[in-house]
Amino acid sequence: MAIGQPFATALGCTIIWRAAGALFGPPAAGDYQGRFPMLFSQHTRLVHVDSPLGPEVLQLQRLEGREELGRLFSHELELVSSNPALPLDALLGKPMSLALELPGGSRRYFHGIVARCSQGAGAGQFASYQVTLRPWLWLLTRTSDCRIFQNQKVPDIIKQVFRDLGFSDFEDALSRSYREWEYCVQYRETSFDFVSRLMEQEGIYYWFRHEKKRHILVLSDAYGAHHSPAGYTSVPYYPPSLGHRERDHFFDWHMAREVQPGSLSLNDYDFQRPGTRLEVRSNVGRAHAAADYPLYDYPGEYVQSQDGEHYARTRIEAIQTQYERVRLRGCARGIGAGHLFHLSNYPRLDQNREYLVVGAEYRVVQELYETGNGGGGAQFESELDCIDAGQAFRPLPSTPVPVVRGPQTAVVVGPKGEEIWTDQYGRVKVHFHWDRHDQSNENSSCWMRVSQAWAGKNWGSIQIPRIGQEVIVSFLEGDPDRPIITGRVYNAEQTVPYELPANATQSGTKSRSSKGGTPANFNEIRMEDKKGAEQLFIHAERNQDIEVENDESHWVGHDRTKTIDHDETVHVKHDRTETVDNNETITVHANRSKTVDRNETVRIGMNKTETILMASLQNVGMGRMENVGLGYSLNVGMMMNTVVGLNQSTQVMKKKTLSVGDSYEVSVGGSDDGSKITLDGQSITLGSQRIELTADREILLRCGQSTIRLTPGEIEILSPNVDINC
C-alpha cells in the first residue's frame, strides 16, 4: 500500500498521517526495534498511548469508546507491542491515557483506569493486547457498604463517599440548592449504585473532563456547567456527496421525536402534618396531539411541598430528554459528552442551533506497521447523541433502589447514662447490626416511630422501647430510608421476665423502675394459667391509683385478705351499705375514732358484748334513749358515777330493788321548790344500824291522818290517837 493511501474501512473519515520512518521502505520481519527503531515510535501516529509500562511499549491499533452524561465511559483498546510477555498486573488498576491529535496541533486526551486487560494470539510480528479504560468512578462498582448519612445534602454525601474512598479528582459545578436529608442509607449496594441513585433522584449528573494525567468528574445540574471546546464552537455539516473536507465536520444527521408524558404528579405523607395535602404537579408543554398524558407516583420521598415540586420537575425533565434526540455522525475529533457546539450549514435551517452532547461513540483505527507504510494511515469517526441546548438534561433513573425484603432487628440506643431516650412522638433511635460506622449512641440513626397496640388522639397504649432492648424494624415500601419499629424481641442479654419453660403458663407485663432500677424495682401485671393455680397478680412498685367514673363491682368466690402497712382512707360521698352474712371481727390495736354527722342506727339481731379494758366515755349532745325489750344488767367492778346536768327521771313500771353493799347516800342540793321522793307500794323497808334524815327547814312524816312535823324550832305530832311507850 502506497504512503498516503486511505485505509479501506467502513469508517467515514480517513486522516492521512504520514510516518517519518516510511521513507526507508518496509522493514524485515522482526526488525522493528532492531534495524528500524523509529518505526515503533508514537510520534508518527494519530493517537498516542501513555501507559504505566512506558510511552513506547504499547501502541494503539483500534479504539472503540462510549461516554454519556451521568454514565460511566468505556473505551475498548486494541494495542500492539513488540513484547509478547507484558505483565498484565502492571496495567490493572493503573491510569492510562490516549492523546488524539487535533487540527492546529493541539491534543484531546482520553484518560482512564485500566479496568480489564487481556492478551490475544497476536498478529504477525507484534503481540496483541486488549485493554478496557474506565473512569475512577467505575472503581466504586467494586466496593459496597451499609452506611447511614444524617442531616446532609446529597452533593455533600456524594463528595464524602468519594473522599472516603480516596478520590479527589472531582469538581462541583452545581448551581441549584438542594434539601438536607435527615436520613439516607447506603444499604447492601455498591458505592457507585448509591451515589448514582442519589444523583438521579436529585437531578444531578456528571461528565468527565480529560487531561493528560487525570480525568475530572464534573458534577452538573444546568447549562452553565458546560462549554464548547476550543475550535469547536461551530461545527459544519457536509453531506457525503461533497467528498472529503479537511476541517472536522459532520456528514450524517438524524433527528427523532417520541411521545412522552406531559406532566408528572407526586404525593407523600408527613406524620407530623397528617392533614396537609402534599401533592405536587409539574408540566412540560409540547405542540403535538398526545402531549398531555399524566404520570402519578407515590411516595414522592419528600415532606415539604417545595421539595416535591423539585422532584416532580426533575423527573419530568428526565423523561422529556427523550422527546427529541439528534444524532450526528462525523469526524469532529474535539467534541465529546458534556460539550456544547453550534451546528451550521445543515439544509434544514431550524436544525442549525446549539446542542448539548449527551452521549458519544468513538471509533479509531490505526494501521499496523506490517502494512509496509510505517503505520501512517488512521481513521477517526464519532457519533454524537445530542439534545437542544435549551432543554434541561436530567438522567433517567436506571439505578436499582435497594429494597429491604423483610424486617430486621436492631438495638435501641441513646446517650451515655440514659435508660430511656425518646422524643415527643415516642420515637427512639437504634443501632443496626449491619452498621459498622456508628458509635451506638444517640447519633446512630434517625428518630423512628414505634408501632403501638393502639394509637388514638391523646388515647391508646404506649410502651417506649428502652436503651439496650432489641426491636423489630420494618421499612415502609421496603425503603431503607423509611424505617418503622413494629415489634420487640428478647435475647440472651435482654431475657424474659419469668423463668422458662418452668413458668410457661405465666403471661403478663413487668416493667423496671428508671433511672437506676434494680430487678427488685418494678410494676407488674401477671397472669398464671396453670390449671388449679390460676392467678392474676398485680404489683405496684410505689403508688396504685384506680379511677372508676361509674359503678365498680368486685366478686370474691372464697376468702379475701387485705393488708395495709400504713394508713387507709375511705371517702364515700353518698350512701354505703356493708353486709356480712356471717361473723365480722374488727381489731384496732391503737385508737379508733368514729364520727356520724347525723343519725346512727345499730341493730343487733341477738346479743351484744362490749368489753372495755379501761375507761369508757360517751358524750350525747342532746337526748339519749335506750330501749331494752327484756332484762338490763349493768355491772360496775368498782366505782360508778352518774352526773345529770338538769333533771333525771327513773320510771320502773313494776318492782325496783336497790341493794347497796355498804353505805348509801342521797344528797339533794336545795332549791326554793324543794325536793320530792314519792314511793308507791304496799311496803317500804329501810334497814340499817343508823338512818339520818336532814332538812334545813322541815321534815314531815305523814301516814293517813297522822303527821309528824320537825322544824328547827319544834316537833309537832298530829294524830287521832298518839301512843308513846317508853
From Swiss-Prot:
Segments forming a coiled coil: none
Gene Ontology biological process terms in this record: protein secretion by the type VI secretion system
Compartments in which it is found: Secreted
Record keywords: Secreted
Phenotypic effect of disruption: Deletion of vgrG1c shows residual type VI secretion. However, simultaneous deletion of all three vgrG genes (vgrG1a, vgrG1b and vgrG1c) totally abrogates bacterial killing.
Keyword Zinc: no
Cellular component annotations (GO), alphabetically ordered: extracellular region; type VI protein secretion system complex
Role: Part of the H1 type VI secretion system (H1-T6SS) specialized secretion system, which delivers several virulence factors in both prokaryotic and eukaryotic cells during infection. Allows the delivery of the Tse5/RhsP1 toxin to target cells where it exerts its toxicity.
NCBIfam families per record: vgr_GE, VI_Rhs_Vgr
Name listed for the protein in its UniProt record: Type VI secretion system spike protein VgrG1c
Gene designation per UniProt: vgrG1c
